[in-house]
């Protein structure tokens, strides 16, 4: 076991006693003690204030890499400990000071069964969040709180309860001074979230084989070309001319250029960013007004300007149907993709059509990618869609070479994995 994976390193001197006891029991796979110590989910989620070690991290890390000394009993005790912690609400994607989740540790140590337990916990959590999405949380007795506050103010005005208010302030100050240190995740996880609205208000630049916004976020990059080519091959298996195609998100125009080569009967593009639309209007993009006028019929080749949420409704109302649909937007979370294939695809995709999307869900971390693959598959099935995942190798060594990868000037790499899972979706049955 590496020195930085030892218990003496992972449990710091500043670790509160109750968390230290829990980490030690989890490390030893002492399930009975773990059960005795856990009385609330918070106990299962406690982290060392310096290392970020959680009981889940500890239970997995202590296994080390597989060796001849491993016994079936040791393995079962480790699985039982991890399962118990997850049952009590241990968080599958909490990171430590090495920016590793418990699943990341399991993958690094080549512990596939423990890794799978973390993946399944992630799937359960994300499916639960999906069920809760759209429901407004109940207020926590706001009116009662206001009434109590008003009562306290009235008593203070009478002068009878003022000393208690002073005492309360002193107690609060003392409590703040005694508040134990809380682990702060690595800065890489504290970056500002990019939203669709922020992106649409941003300035973008096309340069050196990439499209980047003014915050340095990579919107699209040339390394995706092979993925786009394979996506076109999957959406249009025989490259037959005369197909009806819809693409959401123009980006650099990589996939639209490939679609255009097949000489479709209908080729519609939805794009919302003003500066991307300005670029499209130039001859350099190859999708300006000249391209629109080259269609086999008026409106057959068209760039729809606006958000897909509104344009999609218009297409549905006008009865448009497509043989191939591709979805690749920027700054939107998984919920928007799910809404598209749940509410829009049933009406826009031909019964024999094929739907695909850029699968970058959680692609900066393997366990997140694995979790979202399973979650998306379940939600696609709920929407009446079957999905086949085509695995495409990504040469990360080549991408890592500074003179080849084109990542210079990009704030964060949104892709770090060796394999891309390309989704090919068709209607069930």
UniProtKB/Swiss-Prot annotation:
GO molecular function: protein arginine N5-methyltransferase activity
Composition bias type Low complexity, residue spans: 164-174
Chain intervals with Acidic residues compositional bias: 137-163
Compartment annotation: Cytoplasm; Nucleus
Entry's EC annotation: 2.1.1.-
Keyword Ribonucleoprotein belongs to the record: no
Superkingdom: Eukaryota
Matches recorded under InterPro entries: Ankyrin_rpt-contain_sf (IPR036770), Arginine_N-MeTrfase_2 (IPR017408), RMT2/GAMT_Mtase (IPR051038), RMT2_dom (IPR026480), SAM-dependent_MTases_sf (IPR029063)
Binding site for S-adenosyl-L-methionine: 199, 228, 250-255, 271-273, 308-309, 328
Disulfide linkage: none
Main location: cytoplasm
Residue ranges of the region described as Disordered: 41-76, 137-180
Annotated PROSITE patterns: SAM_RMT2 (PS51559)
Stretches assigned to the RMT2 domain: 190-429
Gene3D superfamilies (alphabetical): Ankyrin repeat-containing domain, Vaccinia Virus protein VP39
This protein's UniProt keywords: Cytoplasm, Methyltransferase, Nucleus, S-adenosyl-L-methionine, Transferase
GO biological process, one term: methylation
Entry GO terms, CC: cytoplasm; nucleus
Role description: S-adenosyl-L-methionine-dependent protein-arginine N-methyltransferase that methylates the delta-nitrogen atom of arginine residues to form N5-methylarginine (type IV) in target proteins. Monomethylates ribosomal protein L12.
Similarity remark: Belongs to the class I-like SAM-binding methyltransferase superfamily. RMT2 methyltransferase family.
Quaternary structure, from the entry: Monomer.
Protein name in UniProt: Protein arginine N-methyltransferase 2
UniProt organism field: Neurospora crassa (strain ATCC 24698 / 74-OR23-1A / CBS 708.71 / DSM 1257 / FGSC 987)
Taxonomic placement: Eukaryota, Fungi, Dikarya, Ascomycota, Pezizomycotina
């Amino acid at each position: 076991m590496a020195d930085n994976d030892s218990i003496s390193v992972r449990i710091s001197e500043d670790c509160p006693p109750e968390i230290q006891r829990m980490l030690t029991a989890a490390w030893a796979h002492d399930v009975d003690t773990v059960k005795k110590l856990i009385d609330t989910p918070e106990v299962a989620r406690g982290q060392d204030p310096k290392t970020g070690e959680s009981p889940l991290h500890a239970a997995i890390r202590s296994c080390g890499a597989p060796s001849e000394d491993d016994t079936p009993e040791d393995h079962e005790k480790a699985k039982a400990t991890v399962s118990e912690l997850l049952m009590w609400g241990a968080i599958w994607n909490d990171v430590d000071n090495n920016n590793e989740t418990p699943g990341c540790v399991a993958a690094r140590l080549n512990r596939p069964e423990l890794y799978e337990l973390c993946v399944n916990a992630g799937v359960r959590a994300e499916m639960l969040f999906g069920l809760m999405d759209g429901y407004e949380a109940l207020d926590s007795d706001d009116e009662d709180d206001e009434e109590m506050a008003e009562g306290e103010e009235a008593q203070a005005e009478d002068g009878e309860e003022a000393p208690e208010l002073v005492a309360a302030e002193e107690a609060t100050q003392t409590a703040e001074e005694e508040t134990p240190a809380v682990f702060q995740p690595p800065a890489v996880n504290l970056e500002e979230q990019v939203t669709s609205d922020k992106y649409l208000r941003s300035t973008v630049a096309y340069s050196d084989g990439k499209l980047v916004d003014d915050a340095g976020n990579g919107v699209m990059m040339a390394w995706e070309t092979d993925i786009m080519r394979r996506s076109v091959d999957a959406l249009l298996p025989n490259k037959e001319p005369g197909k009806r195609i819809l693409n959401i998100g123009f980006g650099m125009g990589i996939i639209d250029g490939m679609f255009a080569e097949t000489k479709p009967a209908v080729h519609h593009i939805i794009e919302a960013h003003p500066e991307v639309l300005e670029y499209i209007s130039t001859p350099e993009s190859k999708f300006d007004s000249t391209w629109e006028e080259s269609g086999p019929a008026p409106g057959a080749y068209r760039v729809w300007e606006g958000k897909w949420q509104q344009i999609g409704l218009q297409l549905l109302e006008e009865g448009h149907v497509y043989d191939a649909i591709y979805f690749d937007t920027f700054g939107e979370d998984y919920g928007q993709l799910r809404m598209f294939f749940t509410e829009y695809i049933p009406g826009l995709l031909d019964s024999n059509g094929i739907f695909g999307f850029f699968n970058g869900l959680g692609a900066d971390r393997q366990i997140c990618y694995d979790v979202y693959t399973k979650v998306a598959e379940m939600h696609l099935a709920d929407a009446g869609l079957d999905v086949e995942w085509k695995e495409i190798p990504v040469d990360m060594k080549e991408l890592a070479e500074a003179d080849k990868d084109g990542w210079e000037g990009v704030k964060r790499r949104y892709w770090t994995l060796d394999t891309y899972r390309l989704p090919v979706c068709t209607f069930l049955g």
